[in-house]
Amino acid sequence: MSKIKFFALSRYVEAGLQHAEYARDENGAVVAQVPNADGFYAQGESFEEARENLREVIEGNVMLALQLGWTIPAIEGITIEERDVQNLAA
């Protein structure tokens, strides 16, 4: 059996965005971060820009972690995990 990474990226990203916390920094920029997910933060001049930047950061961090074999934090119970699968092409 081989292993594959099984996940729904859009569901994971949406969970991150739903649970993100937003605040203005001392320079007036909006900072967005996903609690309990190191490296999942972004900023923008507005809420919308910070949210869109955070979407890109979450997607990018997940892709990088998959390539490098790093652990990806669960967000509200949504995980990206490795599973055994049977190769049906043989």
Regions of interest found by a model, annotated:
Residues 38-48:
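A short, exposed loop/beta-hairpin motif centered on an aromatic-Gly-Thr core
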Residues 18, 30, 40-42:
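Structural detector for hydrophobic anchor residues on beta-strands
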Residues 1-19, 52-90:
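Short, charged, surface-exposed hinge/linker loops at domain edges
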Residues 22-37:
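Short aromatic-glycine-(Arg/Gly/Cys) micro-motifs in beta-strand/loop hairpins
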